[in-house]
Regions:
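Mature-chain termini and adjacent capping regions
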Residues: 1-171
Length: 171
């Protein structure tokens, strides 16, 4: 009886070690947020003036990662206010902020609307916060209701005031 129990016990012990290795690999590969916030609202101010309001149904904080980021997997809306208190809005079904790189990525049905009737539709948009520059290398539709123009193309970059707009390829 002892001769059967010892090999059986050893087999069970060694079979568990493979499971432990798999579990350790899984926990290393899977990224877990440091925190989650529901019905998230963040108000950015400068000198007691509201500069931007970010809202999202869900914010996942991954500041515990080697390259920290904040994710908005259920959509995001940001309202920006300029010096004259004009409101510009950007919405997307997904957003991610990389604070150490000062880069914001929005994707899935991105719509940027300005107070003066300009509208940009694109599947993906980046904002370089350091340079205050917005760009996409994807297809876009840019509508200027004041001028009555619609521009379609692939790839575009501009400043946040839309005062310097460059379309890479128009279609």
């Amino acid at each position: 009886m002892k001769s059967i129990v010892i090999p059986l016990g050893m087999a069970m012990l060694f079979s568990c070690s493979n499971d432990m290795k798999n579990l350790q690999q899984l926990s290393v590969q899977k990224k877990f947020p440091q925190g989650e916030a529901y019905d998230f609202k963040l108000v950015y101010t400068d000198s007691s003036k509201v500069v931007a309001v970010l809202t999202s149904p869900l914010n996942k904080d991954f500041s515990n990662q080697q390259m920290p980021y904040s994710e908005f997997p259920e959509g995001v809306k940001v309202e920006f206010y300029d010096q004259a208190r004009h409101k510009n809005t950007v919405q997307a079904k997904y957003g991610i902020i990389y604070p150490s790189a000062d880069i914001v990525e929005l994707r899935d049905s991105v719509v940027l609307t300005t107070y003066d009737g300009k509208k940009l539709n694109t599947p993906q948009l980046f904002w370089d916060q350091k340079e205050d520059w917005i760009f996409t290398d994807r297809e876009f539709t840019f509508t200027d209701t004041k001028k009555g123009t619609v521009t379609k193309g692939i790839g575009m970059d501009f400043d946040k005031k839309f005062s310097s707009v460059k379309a890479h390829k128009t279609t």
